[in-house]
Amino acid sequence: MSSVGTAEPDGDQRDRQVSKLIFFLFVFGAVLLCVGVLISIFGYQACQYKPLSHCSMVLKIAGPSCAVMGLGTVILARSRARLQLRERQRQGHQDPDQSFFCGESRQFAQCLIFGFLFLTSGMLISILGIWVPGCGSDWAQEPLNETNSGEGEPQICSFLSLQIMGPLIVLVGLCFFVVAHVKKKSNLSSSRDTSEIEGGHTHSTEPVHITVGDSVIIFPPPPPPYFAESSAAAPSPGANSLHRIENPPSYSSLFNLSRTPTPENQGAASERDREVIYTISGPGSSSESSHTGHLPLDLPPRYEEKETAPATPLGAPSESSPP
């Protein structure tokens, strides 16, 4: 018993540690992915307006490397999470991710962090596309002919690709927030359903509020259950009597109730004796009938003996009557 009791907490603790590791891998991979995308965009967009010798190769190498490492970490964490979920479903254990962080599930926290990272990255990319780089001599392209140089049209020095990509990444971050909200609602509904299934017979003392249009109708709380379940769970002093009522005595035992009266059945026995007294009819006196009311069930033979006994003295004077 003790080994089984200690094995279950160890298994739950191991599952929680694995969940924390998966959460860390998800967050670390998402951060690497966002940083790699930012470095790659900034490096390649900045280097396309400069000669290759003046552009740093670190940005071109570090950006894609970080993005690939982050994507691989996210895929690894996702596969490990699926394996853990299948193992828990096979063993029938409870999900430790339901209250992972501040009472929220792990998926909800992951979606929040992903949304925040993508939202921040999209805003940074949009800022880079609008204000960086400025209009300088190094970034200005050479005019193709002399006629165009005379025209005083302002040059657009911002990156059009960054201006398009930034809002798209912000939109992806907002989608992650929506997914987090949906995850929270689904977790609340599932926990409510499980609580209703486990304690479906619990009595609620709160009034019921129903909204119809602009008005709110308040109904009183439902009445308590007619038959309490506690009486069935805990044996009460009257449980034996209830059991006796549910299982009536045998038919043959009904004839022996008058012979061995109990304190509980004395009233019923007296009533039954009175019924026997008033239903018996015969030539005997009332004292005899009252006396025979308490006799056993073999009463008819004794009545016959009493009837034959007074018949003999009646016949004797008839014989001696003639002189």
UniProtKB/Swiss-Prot annotation:
- Naturally occurring in which organism (per UniProt): Rattus norvegicus
GO CC terms, sorted: membrane
What segments bear the compositional bias annotation Polar residues?
251-268
- Which Pfam families does its entry note? TMEM171
Where it sits in the cell: the answer is: Membrane
Give TM regions: 22-42, 57-77, 112-132, 159-179
User: In which domain of life is the source organism classified?
Assistant: Eukaryota
Its record classes its membrane topology as: Multi-pass membrane protein
Put simply, this protein is called: Transmembrane protein 171
Q: Where is this region: Disordered?
A: 251-323
Composition bias of kind Low complexity appears in: 281-290
Keywords attached to this Swiss-Prot or TrEMBL record, sorted alphabetically, are: Membrane, Transmembrane, Transmembrane helix
